[in-house]
Swiss-Prot record:
With S4 and S5 plays an important role in translational accuracy. Interacts with and stabilizes bases of the 16S rRNA that are involved in tRNA selection in the A site and with the mRNA backbone. Located at the interface of the 30S and 50S subunits, it traverses the body of the 30S subunit contacting proteins on the other side and probably holding the rRNA structure together. The combined cluster of proteins S8, S12 and S17 appears to hold together the shoulder and platform of the 30S subunit. The modification 3-methylthioaspartic acid is found at D89. Gene3D superfamilies: Nucleic acid-binding proteins (2.40.50.140). This is Small ribosomal subunit protein uS12.
Length: 129
């Protein structure tokens, strides 16, 4: 416990929290340009071909981003919107692509969890009685 005089001389320092997505620089989203689209295999107990893209952000940082959902329209030189969020079984992938923004189409035929995959609402046709 510090003395009163010590607190007058040296104020208490608050702990600095380490961010999990440093490339976003405290922003919720950043835009970028896709450099490479590739597939990556996950860590040990899992097996798949996860879709990943390397993106150069607007702040000149290059990051690996995960492309969620089934099928995607991400190509080289596409403009993408990037959000934070790690993929547990892919080391070094700390970001996600936002589907349905800029040049990226949403997942087609998606009925549940549409907002996460940029899928439009199905149009209901009114019938006469």
């Amino acid at each position: 416990m510090p003395t009163y005089n010590q607190l007058v001389r040296f104020e208490r320092k608050s702990k600095v929290r380490k961010t999990k997505s440093p490339a976003l620089e405290a922003n919720p989203f950043k835009s970028g340009v896709c450099l490479v689209v590739k597939t990556v295999t996950p860590k040990k107990p899992n097996s798949a071909l996860r879709k990943v893209a390397t993106v150069r952000l607007s702040n000149k940082r290059t990051v690996n981003v995960y492309i969620p959902g089934e099928k995607h329209s991400v190509k080289e030189h596409d403009r993408v919107l990037v959000r934070g969020g790690q993929v547990p079984d892919l080391p070094g992938v700390k970001y996600h692509v936002v589907l349905g923004a800029y040049d990226i189409a949403g997942v087609k035929g998606r009925k549940q969890g549409r907002s996460r995959y940029g899928a439009p609402r199905k149009q209901v046709v009114a019938t006469k009685k």
